[in-house]
């Protein structure tokens, strides 16, 4: 199906060849990390310790567990929400509605897991199933992406994403053709964006902590820090779930393999890498250094939450006393750009806070292995790339106002560095 005239966006991620390469490279990288984390040398660079056979990857029980997890999170998504938020205005001038009950889903999941563990659920066996679970999640993401692509073939032009309707099957399958694929009020992209992957990440971390307690008598201080830092991050994302409605993932990118694999497989199985590493490679950590690492994470979170809250408050009500005195630049679209407060320091202060927290998550793992720092390195590359995409879109959208903003706020993420 040819894309509607005038709706094409510039190709990203290296076009069809880049999309094909990423669809192969991302799962391979994920499995490489899972294998290396449990190996003796734990070397990030170099070949994996061994290549798993089909019997080690495929497990019908793992697939059943994966689908059950998705079903549970979908059921929690459908529960009454404390608030229903409206999304951004679409091409047809309508606005979709979204339940903001993600934090409720996290709490209910914790209660269910707690009841299960008290009833004898062997949660500590989960780390031994990470390979087949990751394979099941990858398979699910591929099949789900195919169904999304087929559904998008029947979608009206107004429902298509700006960049996912190039006419090239591989590229559109990767990036996603439809912007907001839904069945009735169930929004697949919004559901997958935070729920299954982030809550699954916390669950895997908890299972690794419990297994370490069984192996060594009690969880290490390093394991407690990693679990605590990352639980705070996930809890924050789900408490402020409404904020995701203004992100690039929701308002610009279609829902294809890139987001489906990222949400369902990449996030839970690679973001838990530090906890995986600590289970197989325990690291000594004293209270003085632990306190310093906590301070680093607190600084990162303070910047991250402060910047995001300031932006969200300003978007909702520019006259709010907390943001009314901030300096702004008017744009031709009628929106105003903040040039003071957090957003006068750098163009993406939330990214700066994110990166500081990412570093704090890796530091409990010591400094003698590169593997636990994969997330920090990967996330740096991801945010720099995302910032570049955002830069191009804002330049096109705001024109001269954006050039003035860049003159007033010259640094993108790190003050005086980048």
From Swiss-Prot:
Q: For this chain's UniProt record, which GO biological process terms are given?
A: cholesterol biosynthetic process
Question: Any idea which UniProt keywords this protein has?
Answer: Cholesterol biosynthesis, Cholesterol metabolism, Endoplasmic reticulum, Lipid biosynthesis, Lipid metabolism, Membrane, Microsome, NADP, Oxidoreductase, Steroid biosynthesis, Steroid metabolism, Sterol biosynthesis, Sterol metabolism, Transmembrane, Transmembrane helix
Superkingdom of this protein's organism: Eukaryota
- Report the membrane topology from the UniProt record: Multi-pass membrane protein
| Membrane-spanning residues | 13-35, 62-81, 102-124, 129-148, 255-277, 287-304, 355-377
GO CC list: endoplasmic reticulum membrane; nuclear inner membrane
Residues binding NADP(+) are 311, 315, 338, 343, 350-351, 390, 394-398, 405
Explain the purpose of this protein: Catalyzes the reduction of the C14-unsaturated bond of lanosterol, as part of the metabolic pathway leading to cholesterol biosynthesis.
Q: What is this protein called?
A: Delta(14)-sterol reductase TM7SF2
Question: Which organism is the protein's source?
Answer: Bos taurus
Lineage, highest ranks first: Eukaryota, Metazoa, Chordata, Craniata, Vertebrata
Gene that encodes it: TM7SF2
């Amino acid at each position: 199906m040819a894309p509607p005239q005038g709706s094409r966006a510039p190709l990203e991620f290296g076009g069809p060849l880049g999309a094909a390469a990423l669809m192969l490279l991302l799962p391979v990288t994920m499995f490489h990390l899972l294998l290396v984390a449990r190996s003796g040398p734990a070397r990030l660079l170099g070949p994996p310790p061994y290549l798993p056979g089909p019997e080690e990857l495929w497990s019908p029980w793992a697939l059943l567990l994966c689908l059950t997890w998705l079903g549970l999170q979908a059921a929690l998504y459908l529960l009454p929400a404390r608030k229903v938020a409206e999304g951004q205005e679409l091409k047809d001038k309508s606005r979709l509605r979204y339940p903001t009950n993600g934090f409720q889903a996290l709490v209910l999941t914790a209660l269910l897991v707690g009841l299960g563990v008290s009833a004898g659920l062997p949660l500590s066996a989960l780390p031994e199933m990470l390979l087949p679970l990751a394979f099941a999640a990858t398979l699910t993401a591929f099949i789900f992406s195919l169904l999304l692509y087929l559904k998008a073939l029947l979608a009206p032009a107004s429902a298509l994403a700006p960049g996912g309707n190039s006419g090239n099957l591989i590229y559109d399958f990767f990036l996603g053709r439809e912007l907001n694929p839904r069945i009735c009020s169930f929004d697949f992209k919004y559901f997958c964006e935070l729920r299954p992957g982030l809550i699954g990440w916390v669950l895997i971390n908890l299972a690794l902590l419990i297994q370490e307690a069984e192996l060594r008598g009690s969880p290490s201080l390093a394991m407690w820090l990693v679990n605590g830092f990352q639980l705070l991050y996930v809890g924050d994302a789900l408490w402020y779930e409404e904020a995701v409605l203004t992100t690039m993932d929701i308002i610009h990118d279609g829902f294809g393999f890139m987001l489906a694999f990222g949400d369902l497989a990449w996030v839970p199985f690679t973001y838990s890498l530090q906890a995986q590493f600590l289970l197989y490679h325990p690291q000594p950590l004293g209270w003085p250094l632990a306190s310093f690492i906590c301070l680093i994470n607190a600084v990162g979170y303070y910047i991250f939450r402060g910047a995001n809250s300031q932006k969200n408050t300003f978007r909702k009500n520019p006259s709010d006393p907390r943001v009314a005195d901030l300096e702004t630049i008017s744009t031709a679209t009628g929106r105003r750009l903040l040039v003071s407060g957090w957003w006068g320091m750098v163009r993406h202060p939330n990214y700066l806070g994110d990166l500081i927290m990412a570093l704090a998550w890796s530091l409990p793992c010591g400094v003698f292995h590169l593997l636990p720092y994969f997330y920090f390195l990967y996330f740096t590359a991801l945010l720099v790339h995302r910032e570049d995409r955002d830069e191009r879109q804002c330049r096109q959208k705001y024109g001269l106002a954006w050039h003035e903003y860049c003159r007033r706020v010259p640094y993108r993420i790190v003050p005086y560095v980048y």
